């Protein structure tokens, strides 16, 4: 449900006839939150990315943070959903990670995973105090679940694809270990009474 993944959906919908938007059930709730906090989303994204003024966004919220043509999902799912499109099976899997509405997709005929933001070619964006809760423990488990599929092609939403089962396994388990370490260290510091500046 992040803007960088859905913001252009209106253009696809305008060019299609009868397209069906499928998403996790929390996506519509995220879109509603974007609408309710339109101005706030402009402000916090300006702080994080520093690009909204340059690109013509109005920080006062006159323009929509969620582009007005973005469709709500026509079909939703909770945990998993199998879709056959053009004779190809796509197995959608929900897991929490950078968002609570995240989907990763297994395409068995290609031994491929479409990973969305579960992988971004940088340390995972596991927390931002001005934004919605992130889920690093569940995120690590999702990466391990992907590795267990033994994919031969890995397609993240950002950055280059990865080919080769061994390479993909190494990448997925390395990022999972980093997230697990982050959680362990954070909990240890919290339980020891650490302050934000420690």
Q: What kind of feature is each model-predicted range?
A:
Residues 187-198:
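C-terminal regulatory/interaction regions
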Residues 59-62, 66, 80-89:
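Gly/Pro-rich turn-and-neighbor structural signature
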Residues 11-17, 144, 148, 191:
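Sec-exported extracytoplasmic/periplasmic mature domains
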Residues 1-73:
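Active-site HxH/HxHxD metal-binding segment of metal-dependent hydrolases
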Residues 71, 82, 89-173, 177-182, ...:
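Metallo-beta-lactamase
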Residues 74-79:
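Short acidic-hydrophobic, aromatic-tinged amphipathic segments that line or gate anion-handling sites
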């Amino acid at each position: 449900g992040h803007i960088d993944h859905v913001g252009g959906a209106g253009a696809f919908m305008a060019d299609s006839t009868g397209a069906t938007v499928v998403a996790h059930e929390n996506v519509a709730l995220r879109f509603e939150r974007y609408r309710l906090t339109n101005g706030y989303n402009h402000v916090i994204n300006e702080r994080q990315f520093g690009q909204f003024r340059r690109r013509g966004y109005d920080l006062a919220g006159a323009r929509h943070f969620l582009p007005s043509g973005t469709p709500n999902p026509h079909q939703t799912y909770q945990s998993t959903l199998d879709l056959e499109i053009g004779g190809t099976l796509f197995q959608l899997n929900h897991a929490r990670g950078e968002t609570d509405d995240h989907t990763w997709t297994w395409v068995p005929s290609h031994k491929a995973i479409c990973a969305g933001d579960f992988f971004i070619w940088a340390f995972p964006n596991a927390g931002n105090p001005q934004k919605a809760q992130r889920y690093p423990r569940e995120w690590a488990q999702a990466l391990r679940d992907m590795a267990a599929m033994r994919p031969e092609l890995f397609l993240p939403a950002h950055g280059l694809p990865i080919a080769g089962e061994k390479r993909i396994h190494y990448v997925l388990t390395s990022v999972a270990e980093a997230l697990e370490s982050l959680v362990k260290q954070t909990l240890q510091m919290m339980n020891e009474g650490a302050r934000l500046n420690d």
